[in-house]
Design a protein with these regions (language model features):
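Detector for methionine-enriched segments
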Residues: 1, 15, 51, 101, ...
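N-terminal single-pass transmembrane signal-anchor helix
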Residues: 1-23
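Intrinsically disordered, low-complexity regions enriched in Pro/Ser/Thr/Gly and acidic residues
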Residues: 70-245
Length: 245
């Protein structure tokens, strides 16, 4: 009886660890698959359009060293920028975006097998569930700042991903959230947040939710890089996952 009791205690202690390790392996393999599929899809869309696509950030960063000239008094994030030498930022400071609309149309309509598209209102229309949290919610929980709250209207905030941004569900369950709205020419940002296992749990940043950024030059899109807006406790950054492939 004592032996059985000891075995039971050991099992109770080790099972959660084993389960957690198994989940990490499963999610790591899923990340590899989705990163590969997403990358191949991007380059396939570019090849099918048969031209160097201008929809990326520069491979080597901005064209000048940018400095902030005005901060938001409420959220303390930068509102306006200029080059360090005082000159204004050029329209292509961060990259070239002229072809983003035609590229995304090719990517999501002719390359990826999309089973559901939400132009906006992703939560109400079923592309996302209530379990998803925006980066502002995650950051406020992990690093609360009573003096300056996190901006609820910036990047992949809760309001943006659930109400304002476009989302797609692919045939394998993968969820893709665009930074901004599909075919919005006023805001062409080649950045995409991807839930690698769809609506399945854990639905956490740094576990199964990661952000990809397209990088390139005047010769077209060259690279799919990681970009990190948030990583929940115990999770990994997108770059860590890419390097751990």
């Amino acid at each position: 009886m004592i032996t059985l009791g000891v075995i039971g205690v050991v099992a109770a202690l080790t099972m959660p660890v084993i389960t957690e390790n198994v989940q990490k392996i499963v999610l790591k393999n899923q990340f590899k698959k989705v990163y590969s599929t997403f990358s191949q899809g991007v380059f396939q869309a570019q090849n099918q359009l048969d031209m160097p696509i201008a929809c990326s950030y520069w491979l080597n960063g901005g064209l000048c060293e940018a400095v902030c000239t005005e901060y938001d008094p409420v959220y303390n994030n930068c509102k306006t920028w200029q080059c360090k030498d005082g000159s204004p930022l050029s329209a292509d400071h961060n990259g070239i975006r002229e072809d983003c609309m035609v590229f995304e149309e090719e990517l999501f309509n002719k390359v990826f097998k999309v089973v559901k598209f939400c132009e906006d209102n992703a939560l109400a229309n079923g592309c996302l569930t209530s379990e998803y949290r925006g980066t502002d919610k995650v950051k406020a929980e992990q690093n609360p700042n009573p003096e300056y709250p996190y901006n609820p209207n910036s990047a992949f905030s809760d309001t943006n991903i659930k109400n304002n941004y476009s989302s797609w569900i692919l045939s394998d369950g993968t969820v893709i959230i665009k930074y901004g709205k599909y075919k919005d020419t006023s805001k062409s940002v080649p950045v995409y947040t991807v839930d690698i296992n769809g609506h399945k749990k854990p639905n956490k940043w740094g576990y199964d939710i990661f952000t990809f950024q397209l990088k390139g030059d005047k010769g077209g899109i060259k690279k799919i890089d990681g970009l990190d807006y948030a990583s929940e406790k115990g999770g990994k950054t997108t770059m860590q996952m890419i390097q751990d492939k």
